Design a protein with these regions (language model features):
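Short, intrinsically disordered, charge-biased short linear motifs at domain edges
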Residues: 45-58, 98-109, 255-258, 384-389
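Low-complexity, intrinsically disordered or signal/transmembrane-proximal segments
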Residues: 13, 37-40, 489
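Non-heme iron-sulfur electron-transfer modules
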Residues: 38-50, 74-107, 125-154, 450-459
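Extreme N-terminal basic, low-complexity initiation segments
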Residues: 1-12
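Compositionally biased, low-complexity intrinsically disordered regions
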Residues: 11-13, 25, 33
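Short terminal hydrophobic/aromatic SLiMs and anchors at protein ends
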Residues: 5, 16-18, 23, 39
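Iron-sulfur cluster-binding electron-transfer modules in prokaryotic oxidoreductases
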Residues: 3, 128-495
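Cysteine-centered iron-sulfur cluster-binding motifs in ferredoxin-type domains/subunits
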Residues: 54-74, 102, 106-126, 366, ...
Length: 495
């Protein structure tokens, strides 16, 4: 699809949205929770409509309810049918031919964020992640979404995985994003005229910098000290447009630790956005293209690195997605996972200057639940002298980003964003560490000026004097250090 066609399509969807009746939204106030029974307005059927679901994935479920406190959709909707337990009950009823997959039933599956917090919480080992991933394609086949939902999702899938298209649509917004004009549009209520989905897109739009519109990192980025290894780096589609500083900081940290970083200029999307939506044909196509791209790099690689947890989660699933027919020649690792395993070089440790700031840790769902990565980011950041890491009370609860969830389910996502922002803000931290671009945009929207949100690689690069970090007080990083190794701390100096 050409860029002008995309712009026309977006304009047409805006007209449709402005002219349509106000969409009936789900109330965010607490509703009486169900008892686990199928609600009375759900249509009964005579035969199964969801063939191909994973055998036995739901069998261990004993309806204990341990998943409910961790479930983000249940948190804001308080409806049994919008919980893992309720959805499993519905799946069993559909498979037994007792329930029809109609629009009402489909809507309860659409409220699932796919955060997998329930998988971590389940004491019986129910693989809800497998169930919801297998169900999403069935929802598309069933055709139970309204025309606006279908068109809007397809528009997002035609734009977000393609940086060139996304940049073309962002070009006219360069004079708007991050300017007083944007503040005026928001304060006047103008953005609400376009409907909740488009308003959510506008609310997430960050200031656009020149680096948002072109990839400026070289293909080969040599190690800055004695070479320890060689890695490839995925730039990410949304991240390279909306937060390009993350990739720059990541490359600098890797170089300073003795790694040559290869960035294939023709790399495409990893397929994470389409994967989360159940668009499996597009996902497999994008995955196969990326595998070919990374495997075409001359010379051996120690790893294919990712700096966005949503991308990493999908790339680690390529073996299953591509049925083992194509696979990376090097292991896929999150950059924090990689550095925690290899360790910082002695030269890099000596470079680290104090960052005497309180930093709240945000665990992206596809990091903590999807990949089991939680200790590594903390391990790396604790190497920074003077840093104080703060933990959120509800670290495992989703922030509401969840791929494109905050665009297609904007009201529920906004409520979750407010809950997460309040939780992080209550730590007293002035900085938040977030390793996923979707989470970062969501948190920046809801935290406002209460805290600045940055990738852990940016914090490390700033401490090493390799990166300018907005949001840090003037002079941080310039103090004297006393002590050795992990005992290095900032000390007062005479002014």
């Amino acid at each position: 699809m050409r860029c002008n066609d995309l712009a026309k399509a977006l304009f047409e969807q805006l007209k449709i949205n402005i002219g349509r009746p106000e969409a009936k939204s789900k109330a965010l106030a607490v509703k009486p929770a169900g008892s686990g029974q199928v609600s009375q307005n759900l249509t009964m059927a005579s035969s199964s409509q969801l063939p191909g679901l994973p055998d036995g994935a739901a069998d261990p479920c004993v309806h204990c309810g341990f998943c409910l406190p961790t479930c983000a959709s249940y948190r804001v909707l308080a409806s049994e049918m919008d919980s893992p337990r309720g959805r499993i009950h519905a799946l069993r009823a559909i498979e037994a031919g007792e329930l029809e997959l109609d629009a009402t039933v489909a809507s309860h599956f659409d409220t699932c964020l796919g955060c997998y917090a329930c998988v971590s919480a389940c004491p019986s080992g129910v693989r809800y992640d497998q169930l919801i991933e297998a169900t999403r394609p069935k929802l598309i086949e069933a055709g139970q979404r309204n025309p606006w939902q279908v068109a809007f999702r397809q528009l997002l899938l035609q734009v977000l995985p393609y940086p060139g298209r996304l940049r073309a649509l962002l070009q006219p917004l360069r004079a708007y994003a991050g300017t007083p004009l944007q503040n005026l549009a928001r304060c006047s209520g103008l953005t609400r005229l376009f409907g909740p989905e488009i308003e959510a897109m506008e609310q997430l739009l960050p200031p656009l910098v020149p680096e948002s519109f072109s990839d400026r990192l070289p293909t080969i980025n040599p190690a800055r000290s004695s070479r320890r290894g060689r890695v490839a780096l995925l730039l990410g589609c949304v991240q390279r447009c909306f937060d390009p500083a993350v990739s720059t900081a990541t490359v600098k940290v890797l170089q300073a630790n003795g790694f040559e970083v290869v960035i294939p200029p023709d790399q495409g999307c990893c397929g994470a956005v389409s994967h989360h939506q159940g668009e499996m044909e597009l996902t497999r196509q994008l995955a196969a293209n990326l595998v070919r791209c990374m495997n075409s790099i001359e010379g051996d690689l120690d790893a294919v690195l990712v700096a966005a947890s949503g991308c990493g989660h999908t790339m680690k699933a390529y073996g299953e997605l591509l049925a083992g027919q194509q696979q990376f020649l090097a292991p896929v690792l999150d950059v924090q996972e990689f550095l925690a395993e290899w360790g910082f070089s002695e030269e890099f440790r000596k470079q680290l200057r104090p960052l005497p700031a309180a930093v709240a840790m945000h665990d992206a769902c596809h990091m903590i639940h999807g990949q089991g990565i939680q200790a590594q980011p903390r391990q790396l950041l604790r190497a920074i002298p003077g840093i104080s890491l703060k933990e959120a009370i509800e670290a495992g609860v989703c922030c509401g980003s969840a791929g494109i969830y905050n665009l297609v389910q904007p009201e529920e996502a906004a409520e979750l964003g407010r809950i997460k922002a309040d939780d992080l803000s209550s730590t007293g931290a002035t900085l938040v560490a977030s390793a996923n671009i979707g989470c970062t945009l969501q948190l920046r929207r809801h935290l406002g000026d209460r805290a600045h949100v940055h990738h852990p690689m940016e914090l490390l690069a700033a401490s090493a004097g390799l990166h300018q970090l907005p949001g840090l007080a003037k002079g941080i990083g310039a103090a004297e250090i006393a002590g050795e190794g992990e005992n290095r701390q900032p000390v007062e100096t005479a002014s």
